Amino acid sequence: MKKLLAAILVLTLAALACVTPFAEPASQTNVGTVVAQTMQALTAVASPAPVATSAPPSGTSDLLPHPLYYLNNDSAGFLQVHRLEMDGKTVQQITFEPGNVETYDVSPVDGSVAYTSNNQLLLVEVDGSDRLLLVDGGPLASDESYATSRVGNVAWSPDGKTIAFGYGGLNFYALDTGAINKVLENQVDTTPGIAVLREGYSPKEYAPDGSKLLINIGYYEGGVYALYYLSGNTLIRSGENAVTCCEGSWTPDGSAYYAASPYLGMISPGLWRINADGKVDTLLDGEFPGPLEFAQAPILGPDGQLYFFHYSLPKAEDIANRTPLYMVRSETDGVTGRTNLYPEPFENINEILWAPDASFAILAIAPLENIFQGGKAEIYYTDGSPSMPLVPFAQEMRWGP
């Protein structure tokens, strides 16, 4: 029982970042440095076969389908946005802030970057030039200010014309006019003598056609996903089986959002499909007493198959601090025809970014199980081709155009 409680506590702490988007962000200074130093001290990091090689697959001129954006430390130890070019070798630092970049997103049109740092929303061109201050939230001096004045969670519209961001609620910044439209106001209760966030709103990800936005509805502890339709300014809440987090993706036609959780604690593991009407289909259940179905990073491939990472734990008592995950492929229900694409599970996965065509996934793998942010970024192919190392550390990975 003690082992089970300890494991649940570790997984709960790992999940807090995705379910409490309005709390004061934890300091991330030197995260990359710590990881890099730890990796240098290790002789090997556990990862499944096949082993890495040093050349792109034959017949291709570039290793990556698009430039890869990610966070890594600068020389001063602050997290900044970097870009790895399609050759898989050339790295350029994009932001140069005197503090950590906390959240960011990349324009799908021209590769420019919108990001938050020092409670400001900023914009730079694809090469890091022409830094522009869009919103200044000012100092955060009280509990209430974090719910009413914190600038965070950025999402760029597919047409590149609008930036959705959190700032006392859900806001839209029009790049052509500079106008800001707040469509949902955070609900803060100060009657207990302290500020308690009853309900707060921030963007997660636009649907491919730009008609709707997956948003976080955050509470004092925890939160859920919901859909916001731009036409009609309509908020669609998830009803029964509301999804709380974590990594996921829209279907190409925007009819549904697949979400998955590899965590256990304040939230449950599982795999869900959020339909356009807000109805949630539970595909894999992670409720007690088990089996517990852990899942992460689902994506619907162009072949109509669902690709994700998965592990089924028969009994809750068998849980470890970090659950290993297999790369799998299945029908859209997450169950039918489910096949492991690698013979061994992956350990200590902190982040997964799929190629748009699901031909490979970039994994950020931590060198130790108690590191929960970022890691060594490496490509693992769904067809069993040799894996490819990219950069020593990456966090919050995004594709550029």
Feature map (PLM): residue ranges:
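Sec-dependent bacterial lipoprotein signal peptides
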Residues: 1-16
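Sequence signature of WD/YWTD-type beta-propeller architectures
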Residues: 18-401
